[in-house]
């Protein structure tokens, strides 16, 4: 189960169908986070049928990215993901508008029907006269170039993510990760030694987190390195294979 069974994501009919299927056929369910399991159980699923095995990323794709570099006087920040209101790119723009030491790169494309939001983001940048510090780049399957460019990676979703794959990718790249404290993300950054969590939609807290990094770069280089070590240890593919194999071997 890789998505949260909530009314925000699925119709009541779809949720009921999934739950009834697991009950009728006594289906064992693997959830990609405790948050996903909680949503499954809250929707009527049987907790005993559901086991949490946290998701994973191919760490080999990120390990050759150069070490973090704070690029002189600037803090290069990357926002990566679909251009959509719930992804919270506007929150990031608002948070950095008065931080003259920040350069922001927003990578992603708008889905069909969400061009208005993309235009809104561009207008924000224009209204705040941030064209020299904020750039937009289209969606790309190769994100290594963007991760190499940045020193800080921001995940700013205003709605809970079932897991938070991009958070793990930022950690694997050895970047300082600031992420939203909701959904499955706190299961990834479960200690302040590995990254920074901020409340969803909280511009003030996000602004403070960015400023804290700028004022103590040495401290947050350590955080970035510890985050990378944790991501390799807990969220790489060999770990996932081991956990699933163990789970299958123990099924009765």
Which residues does each PLM region occupy?
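A conserved mid-protein helix/loop that constitutes part of the nucleotide-sugar donor-binding site
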Residues: 75, 82-98, 116-119, 204, ...
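Carbohydrate-associated surface elements
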Residues: 35, 56
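Short hydrophobic beta-strand element within catalytic cores of glycosyltransferases
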Residues: 176-179, 189
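Acidic donor-binding loop of glycosyltransferase active sites
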Residues: 148-162, 175
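A short, well-ordered alpha-helix in the C-terminal region of glycosyltransferases
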Residues: 205, 212, 219-234, 240-246
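Conserved acidic donor-binding segment of nucleotide-sugar-dependent glycosyltransferases
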Residues: 191-192, 196-203, 212-217
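Short, structured helix-loop element that forms part of the nucleotide-activated donor/catalytic region
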Residues: 36, 41, 105-131, 219
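Active-site donor-binding acidic/aromatic loop of nucleotide-activated sugar
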Residues: 113-118, 131-140, 146, 196-197
